[in-house]
């Protein structure tokens, strides 16, 4: 469900460094098509990605192109189209379940969570909720799943439920899910200490997000400032918090940072277009 760009994603056996709702997205930066998306030229980007799909020599390469198309739609805030193409990528991974179950089920969950992330960021909460559940369910189907990875899927889902509740104005439910996520992290600390170290850094994103939608903008800022990932979405949320606090100069500073983000992934898909609109670009 949370950013670091991945290279050769579809060949990796494990991508566990990617956490709640802001995971990296298609391998590398995505080439010329990704640059076109960054410039707001989505139709041209998808034409480039479609050509890559048509010329791809392997099913894995075709799946990569489909995922790039999904992210292209994300840059336009199109939740439904993003989900449609992520579903196509999931279908590819279903064909890999027998050969590489330790990766295939994980990637199925990743793709569903990626669609969910785009949907929640752009306000389609019902679709986001459905895809977050789908992501948890798909990922947890992994045969002989390790305890730490099982914790990971629970943590991601609780993280998502807290954010969804916060967006819907249900402060009590949001806080309940934050505490559930904390408890799962504590369990992960024992089950898989290395995975715990990867995931604990994403907690300020959650607490800051919940604080922001509860109207506590100072706490939101303080929490976001604890996030050391240089995440484009967090940068955009800091700009939003400064706006709410009436500090337009700081808001502009952070919108400019968000507009300059690089990445072909859900955080950038929200941050870059939103920042450019705010700045009148």
Language model region names:
Residues 31, 68, 107-110, 114, ...:
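"A position-specific structural signal for the A-helix of alpha-solenoid helical repeats
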Residues 18-32:
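Disordered, low-complexity segments in secreted/periplasmic proteins that are enriched in proline
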Residues 87-91, 136, 179-183, 248-266:
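TPR/TPR-like (Sel1-like) alpha-helical repeat modules
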Residues 59-62, 93-104, 139-150, 185-196, ...:
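Boundary/linker segments of alpha-helical solenoid repeat arrays
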């Amino acid at each position: 469900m949370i950013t670091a760009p991945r290279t050769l994603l579809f060949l990796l056996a494990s991508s566990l460094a990617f956490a709640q709702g802001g995971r990296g997205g298609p391998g590398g930066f995505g080439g010329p098509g990704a640059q076109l998306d960054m410039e707001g030229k989505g139709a041209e980007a998808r034409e480039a990605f479609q050509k890559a799909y048509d010329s791809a020599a392997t099913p894995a390469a075709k799946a990569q192109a489909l995922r790039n198309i999904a992210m292209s739609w994300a840059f336009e805030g199109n939740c439904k189209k993003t989900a449609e193409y992520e579903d196509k990528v999931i279908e590819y991974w279903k064909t890999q379940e027998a050969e590489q179950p330790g990766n295939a089920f994980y990637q199925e969950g990743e793709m569903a969570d990626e669609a969910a992330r785009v949907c929640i960021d752009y306000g389609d909460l019902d679709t986001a909720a459905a895809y977050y559940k789908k992501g948890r369910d798909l990922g947890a189907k992994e045969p002989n799943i390790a305890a730490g990875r099982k914790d990971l899927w629970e943590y991601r889902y609780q993280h998502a439920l807290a954010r969804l509740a916060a967006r819907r104005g249900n402060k009590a439910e949001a806080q309940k899910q934050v505490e559930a996520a904390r408890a799962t992290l504590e369990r992960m600390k024992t089950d898989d200490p290395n995975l715990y170290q990867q995931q604990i850094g994403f907690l300020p994103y959650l607490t800051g997000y919940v604080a922001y939608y509860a109207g506590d903008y100072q706490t939101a800022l303080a929490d976001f400032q604890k996030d050391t990932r240089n995440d484009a979405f967090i940068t955009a949320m800091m700009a939003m918090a400064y706006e709410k606090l009436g500090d337009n100069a700081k808001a502009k500073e952070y919108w400019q940072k968000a507009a300059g983000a690089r990445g072909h992934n859900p955080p950038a898909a929200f941050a870059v277009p939103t920042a450019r609109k705010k700045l009148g670009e």
